Amino acid sequence: MQNSESIIKNIKNSSYLIDKEFLVWPENAFIGDKNIELIEKWNLKSYIKERKNFFSDDSVKKEYEEIHKKFNEEAISSYHVIISNLEEIYENCKRNKKIYYQDIMPTVKKVIEFYKKQKKIFIKYFRIPKLSANYHIIHSVNTAILTVALGNEMGLNNYKTVELCSIALLHKIGFLFIPSKISEKKEALTEEELEIIKKYPIISYKIASTSNLSRSICLTLLTHKENLDGTGYPKGLTSENISIESNIIGAASAYSAIILDKAYKKSFNSGASIIELIKDADKKFDKRVLKLIINAISSCPLDFIVELNDNSIAKIVDIDESNPNLPYINYIIKNGKVIDKNEQSSVQSIPNTNTGIKKILNQNEIELIKNKYSLIDII
């Protein structure tokens, strides 16, 4: 049996073809009236159409017991079962150097069922305790759930949704054969180590292509790290040679990475993660795909921190199903003073009043507020 170093060394960058397909997407993505300017530079303004939904969240970063009070016990169990199932799939692949479609189908089904049941709050489960699962496993599960959400926004048929979910679950499979001293390194990678990391899509492709996975799955595993401007890897392809499926997986993976805690990097909250994602959108991601992510994320309750019309800082905590454009907020800073958690009570945000939302805060703005008011965290 070949060891990891041998597998990497023997990889050859052979030529391959990329299939391209048209994408039909709904013209109703929504970020918020005061936040649209953040993505004007990517020429997305003409695509944004207001719809009746908003962002909310009940809790984030609570102690484990508190989280279980807020989150659905059955959903938490289902989420952890998906993680455990994918761990088993990855372990089998590491032993056998192969992966079979029928082996991942039960997990794909569970991911799709999880999304359908938690459609309005699925992002919240990305931030619950993950036990001791491997980062790449958790990242792949979260990417798969988000990919199913994107498929829902696109109105994809079941076959295509299953295919994209399968790719998302497997898109980090190549990391199994990257030496852990490199793949789990907390410090900055050397140039040589970075080049080894960049081979993981090729490893994934080689494993998939020697199994019974479809050509479309194999090629998307190979190219999901390619960027529109040619700065991606492993081949440095440009937009005309990158399939829409690859860009969907790449963008979903990027968002899932931003929102997920790492040993060496603190995660962003859900709202700040969107802003972080769109920073390099013109270089990396298809505008249509970015629009789908904005649409999917803004459709479910989130932990957005916002600035109000009176310059107060608040967190969106609930949504009125009968009037989704009027979310409920808890003040964090009001009249220049920190509001004690025990004194917080939810009020409804009304446009064109003091409680109206001016903008969503990015991570830098959140950090500035934390430092200014000596807050350990904003939750």
Swiss-Prot record:
Disruption phenotype: Mutant cells exhibit a significantly increased flex rate. Deletion does not significantly affect virulence in needle-inoculated mice, but mutants display a reduced ability to survive in ticks and they are unable to complete the mouse-tick-mouse infection cycle.
One Pfam family here: HD_5
Domain of life: Bacteria
Domain HD-GYP as annotated: residue spans: 114-310
GO MF annotation, one: hydrolase activity
Organism from which the protein derives: Borreliella burgdorferi (strain ATCC 35210 / DSM 4680 / CIP 102532 / B31) (Borrelia burgdorferi)
InterPro entries, per database record: HD/PDEase_dom (IPR003607), HD_GYP_dom (IPR037522)
Keyword annotations of the record: c-di-GMP, Hydrolase
Biological role: Phosphodiesterase (PDE) that catalyzes the hydrolysis of cyclic diguanylate (c-di-GMP) to GMP.
Protein known as: Cyclic di-GMP phosphodiesterase PdeB
CDD domains named in the record: HDc
Cystine pairings recorded for this chain: none
Catalytic activity annotation: 3',3'-c-di-GMP + 2 H2O = 2 GMP + 2 H(+)
Enzyme class: hydrolase
EC number: 3.1.4.-
